[in-house]
Amino acid sequence: MTDRAAGPHPLAALTLARFKLTIREPEMVFWVFVFPIVLALALGLAFQTRGEEPVPVAVRDMPGAAPVLAALEQAGGLEAFVTPGEDEAVLLRDGGAHLVVVPGSPPTYRYDAARPESRLARVLVDGALAGAAGHRPPWTARTEEVATPGSRYIDWLIPGLLGMNVMGSSMWGIGFGIVVARSRKLLKRMIATPMRRSHFLASLVLSRLAFLAVEMLALLAFAAWVFGVGNQGGLAALAAVALTGALAFGGIGLLTGSRARTIEGVSGIMNFMMLPMWICSGVFFAVTNFPEAVQPFIRLLPLTALIDALRGVMLNGEALAGVGAELGVLTAWGAVSFALALRVFRWQ
């Protein structure tokens, strides 16, 4: 009785034991202490308070453009520039210009009335031209409302969700599957077979491609049916980009699962790799929200390259040559990851 009374209380001893077990798990320490700080830092950098940015307005390059451009440049809050007529649709779609002024008497405003920033641009341009005349002009500008395919947020979001789906499906389906097989001693049994490691690892990648094709088609069909999201570049180019991305993330998944011993371990490693890309790679908001100093590094992330290539095809109608830089980044990630996975992979 005396010894028991002198020792620690059972509740205190059990609590201390659970605390020690928790802090010995690196994954738990990361999610509890590190991840909230990383998340706050990333989102704080992306949405930090900035000064008021000027509204981009294009002036069609034609007779009469010079005085219009001068009036807009003198007004506050506008960033005016001259553009040839053939570039107007791309500028309006991508946000390079919120409104296009066609010089004339009266001038014509080309803009997408469904976009709030375009409606604001019209008000600012009206005020700038009235101020240049010294009074309210005796004319009312003509308006030419244009519907720019791919200019809605949902059009911009769907390629990001496709890229995120490719990354998650490839990495979890391959890396997690390897660790599960290892924990169940299935890989150990394969040592006695004449199977080559490269064939085994390649089979994991190829099997995931079949599932990925179904997943992508389902999301594309849903987006087209419910929201009217289109694909300007065609299914062949989109499939080629998705395939390159799947192979790249498949190689990364192989690498993460090649040495991990436990399911908890591989889960922590994959979440550590994927969550920063979910935040930084432009899935839900543009990479340009981040400071310019870090944007070159973000552009080198595989998910950033994949999403940029998907958006280039779906929104801009780019051919594969137009997204060659992004495909090169993905190919490099896949080749290096797969080569390293072959070197470090172990059966037990």
Where are these regions (language model features)?
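Transmembrane helix-loop junction
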Residues: L45, V180, R189, T193, ...
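Extracytoplasmic/periplasmic domains immediately adjacent to an N-terminal transmembrane anchor
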Residues: M1-I154, G322-A325
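Hydrophobic alpha-helical transmembrane segments of multi-pass membrane transport proteins
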Residues: V38-L39, P149-W225, M277
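Alpha-helical transmembrane segments and their short interhelical loops
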Residues: R197-M270, L275, L320-L327, T331-A339
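Membrane-interacting alpha-helical segments
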Residues: P8, A12, L16-I23, M277, ...
